[in-house]
């Protein structure tokens, strides 16, 4: 044997032992045996070493073990003896070190211990038929043990568990199967044949995203029949062609959620707004459309508000547009900028690449008026020129070659305040009702012979007539300070007829009274610039509530937030005998939707500020590039 091997423990030899065990009746209960003391014999040594005392909990009726089985169990006991003996002299064998004896956590009854030598013969069913004081698992009456027992135990606890699983499964099925099936609206791009005659003839081919219960008529079912007709500025009878009463509670105007309206998610950088327009700021409540301006930090801006547009969904050309509104805040303090206005559909509000070269052009001539800065060095115009004049070169990018196109603006109102007298402590509310035009008259001065103010005690012409980006004709009308904050509503709107010269006009009104009017001749031919038009373009509709120092300096301490502008309804009327009137974004001779679809990089990117930045080239024209048209 090599050196060092003698120190290793020797493998014991297996010996046959008496299979019959003796019981000490004085030490243990009558139903269990006593401690077992067995000697181990090893080859090469006559000495004996006692094995540790191990309690053998045997019942008297156990079948004696065969010698082979007993020898195997004794070998196992011998192997266990190499570790420190864990026992208690009080015969409560715990199987734990003595340092833990006496702990409440580790106390167990003596019948819970099994010697390894009895695993092959003891009936283990007593484990779950005996009650354990601190463990429900060993309580036969517990619902936990009933799963292992021979007889089922179905009590109220188990019944409640099963009932809960049933309800949970039913709820999941209703949520993910039944509810989607009930709310599915069917074909989201139905053919026009499925709509009524008005919808089939006048709605565009715009494809809408998923929406809940789309309308199949342009007239809201909640509009009273008494509002189906109205007398126009020209004395003719007009018919209702579109209405939205905003009576359905909790409408959402996120992209794709509504047929006619969409709330934008942009910063309106064109006017240096101090707020971010968020769709979450707009909803319907108590039968009104509510646009809420909040004063909190949002996307690196101090305010959050909303802008609702009908761009490329709902447009009008000619007729009367009427809105019932209660303006935000109070007429006593300046600072807020409520707006209800219309814009040519070729420009998407807030997307500056789309307004580049089209706002606020209402022009169909081929002269100096279409050139950058109107070819003038006096700073009268900073506009880049008309992008879509009537004289673009052959095969250039144009929605309707031969027709001058643009995006003029007509405002139903822009809210502000002013003092009736210089020494007044508080302001009073006013609205500006205006039209924006390009190219410009000399020093932006219109021909006042073609303007009319109907009551100069409450309405006067605005001294602001324009700047390098627009020519503005505006009338200022005094309001009642109760028409704010949802306390009372008032009607605002305009009646207009597209055209040049005396063929076109715009008349604004507040309540039942017209405030002021202009004929197209007010912006007729003037020097090097030809006649501008009362808009021939399909006009989209915009509601917004903003705050900007471009409009009015605000004193934060005088304003109250949140400020809410409420819209009760919007209604559009048109003369049934006027063939030039149209509801929709593609009137004859003035299409827009196809052109918009062909230029997605501009119309879907609010961060592009010029047409070239969006990746498109400026169309050439015969005046500047000497080409064929």
UniProtKB/Swiss-Prot annotation:
Q: Where is the composition biased (Basic and acidic residues)?
A: 1-13
Q: Which SUPFAM superfamilies match?
A: Concanavalin A-like lectins/glucanases
The residue ranges of the GH16 domain are: 231-578
Q: Which GO terms describe its biological process?
A: (1->6)-beta-D-glucan biosynthetic process; fungal-type cell wall organization
| Topological category with respect to the lipid bilayer | Single-pass type II membrane protein
Stretches assigned to the Lumenal side: 183-629
Q: What Gene Ontology molecular function terms does this protein carry?
A: glucosidase activity
Gene3D superfamilies listed in its UniProt record:
2.60.120.200
Q: Where is the composition biased (Low complexity)?
A: 39-52
Q: Where in the cell is it found?
A: Endoplasmic reticulum membrane
Q: What does this protein do?
A: Required for synthesis of the major beta-glucans of the yeast cell wall.
Family under the similarity heading: Belongs to the SKN1/KRE6 family.
What is this protein called in UniProt?
Uncharacterized beta-glucan synthesis-associated protein C23H3.11c
Organism name = Schizosaccharomyces pombe (strain 972 / ATCC 24843) (Fission yeast)
């Amino acid at each position: 044997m090599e050196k060092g091997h003698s120190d290793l423990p020797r493998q014991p030899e297996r010996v046959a032992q008496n299979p019959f065990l003796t019981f000490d009746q004085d030490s243990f209960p009558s139903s269990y045996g006593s401690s077992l003391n067995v000697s181990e014999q090893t080859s090469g040594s006559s000495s004996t070493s006692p094995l540790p005392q191990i309690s053998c909990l045997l019942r008297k009726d156990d079948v004696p073990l065969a010698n082979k089985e007993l020898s195997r169990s004794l070998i196992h006991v011998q192997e266990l003896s190499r570790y420190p003996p864990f026992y208690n002299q009080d015969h409560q064998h715990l199987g734990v070190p003595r340092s833990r004896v006496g702990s409440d956590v580790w106390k167990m009854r003596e019948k819970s211990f099994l010697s390894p030598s009895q695993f092959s013969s003891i009936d283990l069913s007593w484990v779950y038929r005996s009650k354990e004081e601190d463990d429900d698992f060993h309580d036969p009456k517990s619902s936990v043990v009933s799963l292992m027992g021979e007889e089922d135990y179905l009590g109220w606890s188990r019944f409640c568990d099963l009932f809960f699983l049933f309800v949970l499964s039913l709820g999941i099925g209703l949520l993910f199967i039944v509810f989607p099936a009930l709310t599915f609206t069917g074909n989201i791009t139905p053919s026009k044949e499925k709509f009524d005659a008005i919808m089939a003839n006048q709605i565009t081919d715009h494809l809408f995203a998923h929406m809940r219960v789309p309308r199949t008529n342009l007239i809201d079912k909640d509009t009273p029949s008494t509002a189906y007709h109205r007398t126009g500025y020209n004395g003719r009878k007009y018919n209702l062609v579109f209405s939205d009463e905003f009576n359905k509670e909790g409408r959402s105007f996120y992209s794709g959620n509504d047929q006619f309206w969409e709330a934008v998610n942009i910063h309106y950088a064109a006017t240096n707004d101090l707020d971010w327009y968020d769709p979450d700021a707009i909803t319907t409540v108590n039968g009104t459309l509510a646009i809420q301006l909040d004063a909190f930090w949002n996307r690196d801006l101090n305010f959050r508000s909303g802008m609702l547009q009908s761009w490329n969904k709902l447009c009008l050309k000619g007729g009367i547009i009427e809105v019932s509104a209660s303006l935000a805040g109070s007429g006593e303090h300046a600072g807020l900028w409520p707006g209800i206005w219309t814009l040519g559909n070729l420009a998407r509000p807030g997307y500056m690449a789309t307004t580049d070269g089209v706002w606020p052009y209402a022009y169909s001539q081929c002269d100096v008026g279409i050139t950058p800065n109107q070819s003038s060095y006096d700073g009268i115009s900073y506009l880049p020129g008309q992008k879509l004049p009537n004289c673009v070169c052959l095969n250039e990018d144009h929605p309707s070659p031969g027709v001058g196109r643009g995006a003029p603006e007509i405002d139903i109102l822009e809210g502000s305040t002013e003092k009736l007298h210089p020494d007044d402590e508080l302001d009073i509310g006013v609205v500006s009702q205006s039209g924006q035009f390009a190219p410009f008259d000399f020093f932006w001065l219109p021909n006042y012979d073609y303007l009319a103010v109907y009551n100069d005690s409450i309405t006067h012409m605005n001294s602001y007539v324009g700047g390098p980006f627009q020519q503005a004709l505006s009338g200022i009308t005094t309001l009642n300070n109760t028409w704010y904050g949802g306390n009372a509503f008032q009607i605002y709107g305009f009646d207009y007829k597209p055209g040049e010269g005396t063929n076109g006009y715009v008349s604004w009104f507040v309540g039942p009274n017209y405030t002021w009017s202009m004929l197209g001749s007010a912006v007729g031919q003037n020097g090097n610039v030809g006649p501008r038009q009362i808009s021939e373009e399909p006009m989209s509709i915009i509601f917004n509530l903003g705050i900007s120092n471009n409009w009015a300096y605000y004193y934060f301490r005088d304003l109250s937030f949140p400020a809410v502008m409420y819209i009760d309804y919007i209604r559009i009327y048109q003369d049934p005998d006027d063939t030039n009137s149209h509801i929709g974004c593609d009137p004859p001779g003035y299409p827009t939707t196809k052109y918009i679809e062909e230029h997605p990089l501009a119309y879907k990117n609010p961060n592009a500020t010029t047409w070239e930045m969006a990746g498109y080239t400026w169309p050439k024209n015969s005046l500047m590039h000497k080409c064929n048209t």
